[in-house]
UniProtKB/Swiss-Prot annotation:
NCBIfam families: nusB (TIGR01951). Gene3D superfamilies: NusB-like (1.10.940.10). The keyword RNA-binding applies. Involved in transcription antitermination. Required for transcription of ribosomal RNA (rRNA) genes. Binds specifically to the boxA antiterminator sequence of the ribosomal RNA (rrn) operons. Signal peptide: none annotated. GO terms for molecular function: RNA binding. Disulfide bonds: none annotated. Coiled coil: none annotated. Belongs to the NusB family. It comes from Frankia casuarinae (strain DSM 45818 / CECT 9043 / HFP020203 / CcI3). Residues 115-135 are annotated as: Disordered. This is Transcription antitermination protein NusB.
Length: 135
């Protein structure tokens, strides 16, 4: 699917949705579409032995949402973003996916100078200190 088609598909689904799609879900989709290149770079950097194309599509998209939350949603504590991603992987993907998702996201958090997942209660200004990141 072309990234440029996502906004049109989202708008059509929102118009037909009953019950309505949450505002937060819409923000996540829009955020991933807007920052997909940056998000995919981060995933590729920490996906040891895997390319994005080789990952199961479900894992790839779970990771995209989690990376968006970890790096661009200071209102979401790191631990919550990681736990939710692991739960999604448990429920929607392969038996190996939860460990893969957890390991990749933990490495990303540690590698970017953010709090380790076990210690994280939020990021505060830590995200602002990431080189090349918008404040």
């Amino acid at each position: 699917m072309r990234a440029s088609a996502v906004p049109e598909i989202l708008a059509a689904r929102l118009a037909q949705s009953d019950p309505p799609v949450s505002e937060y879900a819409v923000e996540l989709v829009e955020g991933v579409v807007e920052r997909r290149g940056e998000i995919d770079e981060r995933i590729a950097r920490y996906a040891e032995g895997w390319t994005l194309e080789r990952m199961p599509p479900v894992d790839r998209n779970i990771l995209r949402i989690a990376v968006l939350e970890l790096l661009w949603r200071p209102d979401v504590p790191d631990r919550v973003a990681i736990d939710e991603a692991v739960e999604l992987a448990k429920n929607l993907s392969t038996h190996r996916s939860p460990a893969f998702v957890n390991g990749l996201l933990a490495s990303l958090v540690e590698g970017k100078g953010l709090a380790t997942p076990a210690e994280s209660t939020g990021r505060g200004s830590a995200v602002d200190s990431i080189p090349g990141q918008p404040s």
